Design a protein with these regions (language model features):
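Glycine-rich phosphate-binding loops of NTPases
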Residues: 111-173
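Short beta-alpha junction loops
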Residues: 146-147, 175-176, 400-402
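Short acidic, S/G/P-rich loop/turn micro-motifs used as interaction or catalytic elements
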Residues: 77-78, 146-150, 178
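Conserved P-loop NTP-binding catalytic core
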Residues: 2-5, 13-16, 52, 73-138
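Short, surface-exposed beta-strand/loop "edge" segments at domain boundaries and coil↔beta transitions
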Residues: 29-40, 104-115, 179
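Extended helical coiled-coil dimerization/tether regions that scaffold
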Residues: 2-34, 44-47, 174, 178-344, ...
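Switch/communication elements of ASCE P-loop NTPase nucleotide-binding domains
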Residues: 2-87, 307, 317-435
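A structural signal for short, well-ordered beta-strand segments and their strand-loop junctions
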Residues: 141-144, 220-224, 281, 365, ...
């Protein structure tokens, strides 16, 4: 903040107050409907945690112990609580081997303990069933690029919605675009996540991530587009889209996108039409493939956001039929489909995390980020996330089999929990920092 002191005739620069961080302190599990298990993520009494920085918690253990199920159950727990708190509807939990039945967390400088009672069909907050206060729910980002991804996705391709269409949940995994595992779909959804960034300083972190990976802070998007006949004006553009919807849009997803676009106000539609005209001009100049160059710097961020948003809408409506994204390394142009899957996956993960971290109380769930990554790259995952989320108060809960992630954690900002199954059931063990 900048203020002027009229007495001393000087300009005073005041630091912005630090945002209160979100921290998940405890997860209570019900295992096989009989055993209660606590996962302790709280700070140790003799250690110092800076809540204004991102916190890391790792869940480690052998295959089949239930690490991924725990992450999924955290999402379902907060979805259930949201429905109960806002709509007074209690949802009976589908019987699973592992269920989250309680969480303790820090948000907005306060401590909250939320638990559910299946017998009473109630939620309790700080041991009270009178929910007459403004209880913050974390903004959850879920990311997984494995073939057996278990995270739920929103229904974003029709007028109907599912229970995960809530403002506090974002899925940024490989199935984000169309519920299938597709490299090209993941790539274009990454552009959508870029569009969701509102603050310039947050967008410029994308530039920093590219540099950290060894790439230049620029990209080129090439695309082929569908030429609409006899479209010379905005009115003609709208009429052509209506005709597309009535005659040619047999795919329900595309039809929904067309309906959604046509329902927007005139100003928004004119912006997209302007981008379409730019594409037509390149085609009129004899170019079969159109391209856009994006430089991530302070002066061009806003115009790039507008261009990308409009291109994304044109792609959704089927007017852009093919896209390719190119990155640059040492002056050489590299097709993004040719970069390593590990690089692409982690870049998409961090971009998704950034989009949610602009909001308060961000909880980022990442399932086995080491998948498809060489051991040398695994050693950089934590550094990669630290770089992208530097100065952002959030909590990352990560499941992993990689000892490289454990060894690279920042002291006093991280916890490691070992999960194991014995003849007595599930065992949760907090690993000491000095181990």
């Amino acid at each position: 903040m900048v203020t002027y002191d009229p007495i001393k005739h000087i300009i005073l620069f005041e630091e912005e107050p630090k945002r209160a961080g979100f921290r998940l302190d405890k997860i209570e599990l019900l295992v096989c409907n009989s055993q209660m298990v606590d996962i302790d993520l709280s700070r140790q009494k003799d250690s110092f945690f800076d809540d204004s920085l991102c916190q890391f918690s790792l869940l480690i253990g052998v295959n089949g112990v239930g690490k991924t199920t725990i992450l999924r159950s955290i999402i379902d727990f907060f979805i259930d609580f949201h429905e109960y708190y806002n709509h007074d509807g209690y949802r009976m939990t589908t019987r699973k081997n592992i269920q989250v039945v309680g969480v303790k967390y820090q948000a907005n400088g306060n401590s909250y303990y939320v638990c559910k009672n299946e017998n009473e069909k109630k939620f309790y907050v700080n041991d009270s069933d009178i929910l007459n206060q403004n209880i913050p729910i974390p903004n959850i980002v879920a990311s997984c690029f494995g073939v057996f991804d278990k995270f739920p996705i929103k229904n974003t391709m029709s007028l109907s919605t599912n229970r995960y269409n809530v403002p506090f949940y974002t899925y940024v995994g490989a199935r984000a675009a169309n519920n299938t595992f597709s490299a090209s779909s993941s790539l274009f959804h990454m552009l959508y996540n870029l569009l969701s960034l509102k603050k310039t300083e947050t967008i410029l972190k994308v530039r920093d991530i590219l540099k950290y990976m060894g790439y230049e802070d620029r990209m080129r998007l090439t695309c082929r587009f569908k030429l609409l006949a006899n479209v010379q004006s905005f009115r003609g553009f709208v009429q052509a889209l209506k005709k597309e919807m009535d005659l040619g849009a047999s795919v329900s997803r595309r039809r929904w996108y067309l309906e959604n676009f046509l329902s927007k106000d005139k100003n928004d539609k004119q912006k997209v039409f302007s981008t379409y005209q730019d594409l037509r001009k390149q085609a009129d100049d004899g170019l079969s493939v159109c391209h856009y160059d994006f430089q991530f710097n302070q002066s061009q961020v806003q115009s790039h956001k507008d261009d990308l948003r409009n291109l994304y809408l044109l792609k959704q409506m089927g007017l852009i039929t093919q896209t390719k994204l190119f990155l640059y390394k040492n002056g050489e142009q590299i097709n993004s489909l040719d970069i390593s899957s590990g690089e692409l996956n982690m870049f998409c993960t961090v971009v998704g995390a950034l989009s949610a971290s602009e909001m308060e109380n961000a909880l980022i769930l990442i399932d086995e980020p080491e998948i498809s990554q060489h051991p040398n790259w695994q050693m950089s995952i934590i550094d990669f996330l630290n770089k992208g989320l530097e100065g952002i108060p959030c909590h990352l809960l990560i499941t992993t089999h990689s000892h490289f992630l454990v060894s690279d954690l920042t002291r006093n900002r991280s916890t490691v929990t070992y999960l194991n199954k014995t003849h007595e059931g599930l065992v949760s063990e907090r690993i000491k920092e000095e181990t």
